[in-house]
C-alpha cells in the first residue's frame, strides 16, 4: 500500500512530466533506482538534450527546492545518470529540479522548473 508521501510524489512527477511533454519532450524513463541513487524522470528535449529531472513536491507554503537538492543529492543523481547512460550513444545532458507546491486551499500545483542546476539554476 502506498503512503500519502508516495501518492504526493507520484502526483508531482505526473505534473512535472506533463510540463516537459507540453514542451515537446519525450519520456525516456521514470523512477529509475540504483544502489547509488534514483532518477525521478528522464526526458529527451526536442533539441536532443537528455534531462535528468528531480521532482520535489510539497503541500502548503513555498519551500526552498535548492536546499532540498544539496551536493549529496546531486552526487547521487550524477552517479545514477552515469549508470543509466552506460552503453548508450553520446548525448548532451543536463540536470533539472522541478519544485511543485500544492495550494493548501485549491490543491492546484504551482510549478517552478530550475534548469541545469549543476551549472547554476536558470
From Swiss-Prot:
A Pfam family in this protein? UPF0102
Domain of life per record = Bacteria
Q: Which InterPro entries match?
A: Restrct_endonuc-II-like (IPR011335), tRNA_endonuc-like_dom_sf (IPR011856), UPF0102_YraN-like (IPR003509)
GO MF annotation terms: nucleic acid binding
Q: Which family does it belong to?
A: Belongs to the UPF0102 family.
The UniProt entry, under PANTHER family, shows: UPF0102 PROTEIN YRAN
Q: What's this protein's name?
A: UPF0102 protein cgR_1859
* Organism field: Corynebacterium glutamicum (strain R)
